[in-house]
Amino acid sequence: MVLKVKMGDIGVAKSPESIETLLGSCVAIILYDRGKKIGGVAHVMLPKSRNSSEKNPGKYANTAIPELINRMAKLGARKDKLTTKLAGGAAMFKCNSNTIDVGKKNIEASREEVKKMGLRIASEDLGGDTGRTITLSLKDGSVLVRTGSELKTI
C-alpha cells in the first residue's frame, strides 16, 4: 500500500508500505529507521512558523521535523537510528531580484532544522527548476525520485 502525503502534511508508516509525495518548491524531509523499518515524510511548504502551537506542523520546516520524529517514535522508531534524506526545493517560477525563491528558502531552512535536531543528511536531491515525485520504500529506506522521465535513487 502507498501512503500519499499531501502538501503541508506528515505521513509515517511501517514496512511493507511505501510513502509518496509530489514536490515543486516544497521540500520532503524523509526519515527512516532501518532496524525497525519505520519511515516518515514531511511535505514542508514554507521555511518557518512563528507560532509554536502550529495547527499544521508539517507545513513548516521548524515544526515539521520534531512532529515527524514524535510520530515515528510512537510507532517504535528511535531518533538515534534515523537516516535523513531531503528532496525538492525546485525554483518552479522565474525569480528576479524582487521575488523570493521559495524553493531555495525551503532548502536552507530544512537543512538548518535537520542540523538543529542533531540529525545528519545521508543524501539529497534538491533544487533545479522541475518538480519531482518521491517514493520512500519502507522495506529498505531507499527513495525513488522521478523528475520528468528521469529516475534515480537516493
Swiss-Prot record:
Name of the gene this protein is made from: cheD
Family: Belongs to the CheD family.
Record flagged with keyword Hydrolase: yes
Catalytic reaction list: L-glutaminyl-[protein] + H2O = L-glutamyl-[protein] + NH4(+)
GO biological process: chemotaxis
Protein name (record): Probable chemoreceptor glutamine deamidase CheD
Gene Ontology MF, one: protein-glutamine glutaminase activity
Upper lineage: Archaea, Methanobacteriati, Methanobacteriota, Methanomada group, Methanococci
Keyword Hydrolase (UniProt): yes
Organism encoding this protein: Methanococcus maripaludis (strain DSM 14266 / JCM 13030 / NBRC 101832 / S2 / LL)
CDD domains reported for this sequence: CheD (cd16352)
Annotated EC: 3.5.1.44
Keywords in alphabetical order: Chemotaxis, Hydrolase
Function noted in UniProt: Probably deamidates glutamine residues to glutamate on methyl-accepting chemotaxis receptors (MCPs), playing an important role in chemotaxis.
